[in-house]
Amino acid sequence: MDHILTSCPHPTNTTLWDHAKELWPHEEGTWPDISLGTIIGCNAISVETTKETKGRDGTPQKRKSHDQGATRLLQILLSETAYLSWTLRCERTIREREHTEPEIRATWLKTINRRLSEDKTTATKVLRRKPYTSLVKNTWTKALQKRHSNLPDDWINRNVVF
């Protein structure tokens, strides 16, 4: 399983993991080493950010805090990429169907856009609660800004994709 998901040198795996890493916008939370343990335990991963604050005496202090949006995005990228790696491998070995790099990229983008669309729909039409809308925005905004230089503030209500 470890070989299939992480260390297989087939271009499908390297292409998928490269796209996931490329989408990751958080410099402060470095991209993890991909291993079977990372994939299986992705739900337990936590991304911490360092913020500078002033102490009671006015001196600058660095404080680490849990970044819920970045954590959620990383969990989505790891789990969706691993699942897609598995399904494309099954197609390659069982159905004997090779995928080109453009097909792999398009399939991966379709998967991530589907997740983004599900989040937007849930936030704006199903739950409609400020905390969930904020979570969705915190999850996707930095990644979308990496792709769209003029991302509108109300992107959650628009047809924005990767």
Where are the regions a protein language model picked out?
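Family-specific functional microsites
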Residues: 1-162
